[in-house]
Amino acid sequence: MPLSTDGPTLNLELNLLMFEPILDFVACPDPQGTHRMAYWSWGEKSAAHVVFCVHGLTRQGRDFDLLAQALVASAKDAGLPDIRVICPDVVGRGKSDWLQDPLGYQFPQYAADMAVLLQSLNTQRAIERLDWVGTSMGGVIGMLLSAQKLPVPVQHLILNDIGPPVSWKSILNMKTYVGEVGKFQTVQDAANAMWQISKSFGPHTSEEWLALSQNMVRRLEDGTYCLHYDPQLRVPIRALTEEQAKAGEATLWQIYDLIQCPTLLIRGAESELLSAAAAQEMTQRGARAQVATLPGVGHAPTLTHQDQIDIVLQFLGLPA
């Protein structure tokens, strides 16, 4: 069932941020001890309505700056209960620690970390409503948590160009670039390099892409830049076989079939990762997702353009 994007829109501009997020950390256990996971918090800490926005494989939590602002502003402008938006840097990315054992960069650790963060937030302020927006990897984490009987259940799940099946061709492509963090003289150089492997994100102006790239790099001691994440993320990906990928897909379908909350699948019409047939199957079993298809976009929509933001707002019952 497609979603309409008709109606007035929030007037958000990339270069006019309403406010800055608060950076915080939570300690998460792993087999070697503990690591800190960073998360970016938007909105009032007292808000009982929390939206998690979780990024893709080599991305980080600041990808959601515009969406987070739109969520907070939409509720406030409409006189609805305040919303707090939580955008984690999954371990090994952004401001989070790197794991001692790179084989830990897999979904069981990611989901466990999110459960720890969720428990910490719920202790600070009881969460009455939890929604989840997950791009690619972040969507898989969302499926894992949505299928569980958590003390704070996910009430609305948005999967951004991800489902149980992931094409083997896409995985082979990941094997070629994940871990190649590069070395760049300027942020613009890094942005240009990232664009070469990210054109499937859909049309973006040079200004929009540079804004998305600012938090994708870290500055080295010699003044140059590299991508923000641990290069060892490549270890479990390069070790993955096609047979293991097929077994993982079967397991994810079993998990998807357990999801009972309202679910929206946002799919790039040109996505090579998630086929139209797979998206159709997701409407017929398990969570029986609604589907919003974005023309001219592949994997994965950035959720920075107003039409994409409006789809999220509408599904969550917020005015666009």
Language-model regions, residue ranges each:
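Active-site loop/oxyanion-hole signature of alpha/beta-hydrolase fold enzymes
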Residues: 31-33, 66, 72, 81-133, ...
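The serine-hydrolase catalytic nucleophile loop
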Residues: 57-69
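Conserved alpha/beta-hydrolase catalytic His-Asp/Glu region
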Residues: 185-239
